[in-house]
């Protein structure tokens, strides 16, 4: 049985966004499910756009997502080099073969000449197809042009036929090659075109399955024609559905497209991101959504992918006035956080992951988010028992680990003050002073240790004072935190303990100049 070999082949011209990451994941999961190999290949033939910085970001993104490649940059393998700019000599060898066999030819048409023909076709309302002007040049004519060092491209001589793409997701799709024309396979700078290099690379690297986004479906007939011209065996093709935002439109910088590393910095785990992205266009056999890596790798099959667009629901739908001004690529992490959809499937998965994961694992994952946390240095270690105790108590409230530091900081506050006059007035107005005095008495006289015990104590204060809702809870929040908004009080109180609670209330009451007795 032939070994399954898949590949992810990004261009290093930007960050790795969700669409590209999903493509990588589908290839990775399919290879693992079939006990095959997952390759990484860097397609940097567009020298104007390719950068070393982007290359490094792509590698960092894949490593964070936990998608280790079996062959590729940094790993090596028997089918390298795995960077296209290092394979130019290989492409030239195959190009010479095509030209010799009259399956390709040099084209000396100038850019201005071709642009004029394109404009003419546009004016007539017909698609532009190269007219084959250079396809029948004599050897003498070609030699003369080469001697003059006239720049040229190399075009593939497209045979007229019906090309059928037998796609594992989209089904059978037919294309008429005469509508494609003789397309460029080598650019004037000597670098191969995308559609040309990818075929040679896939063939020599023994790729058996090409899994990518549906946007590449229109490229596939060109690639099939090149496969056939060389006599290479065809891989299986699978084109995954488009990913759209909450507005139903294709992901873009105006509709939620951003680097996958932004989700790391927002506090999502790589496990959660893998799980979420796997469901962008694919469903498990039993309909299960929250899945471990082992489960995903055991049941993933591209033939269960849908043709329908997959909705990326992580960000809220932008308001009309925001659509032109908001650029997700340029937003800071805090800026991105403001647009997160609190009811997204990613948040649900992330909360479940945080609740279910071993607390020691969470503690280590939390460490990067504690660097700027206003707590003693000793507590910035994910192994600190007291830190883990706090994290264990509040984890149920977290959708992202970046939300944990405020809880932790609150626990360590020593010298409290009121954040503003609004917080002060919560205690001073109405029955505020009566509420806080009664709560102080109950806390000081009782041994309260659990969130439920503190809930009961606040309810008891309500019965005694006749206050409820905002006029009950807000004065208590103000006298214990100095703030008008914040964390879940019962959880906070149980973490602080009786001694700190009493000290806090006495400290803030002193600032107001009121008695709690």
Swiss-Prot record:
The keyword Ligase applies. GO terms for biological process: glutamyl-tRNA aminoacylation. A motif ('KMSKS' region) lies at residues 250-254. Binds 1 zinc ion per subunit. One of its GO terms (cellular component) is cytosol. It comes from the Bacteria. ATP binds at residue 253. It is found in: Cytoplasm. PANTHER family: GLUTAMATE--TRNA LIGASE, GLUTAMATE--TRNA LIGASE, MITOCHONDRIAL-RELATED. Belongs to the class-I aminoacyl-tRNA synthetase family. Glutamate--tRNA ligase type 1 subfamily. This is Glutamate--tRNA ligase. It comes from Leptospira biflexa serovar Patoc (strain Patoc 1 / ATCC 23582 / Paris). The lineage of its organism: Bacteria, Pseudomonadati, Spirochaetota, Spirochaetia, Leptospirales.
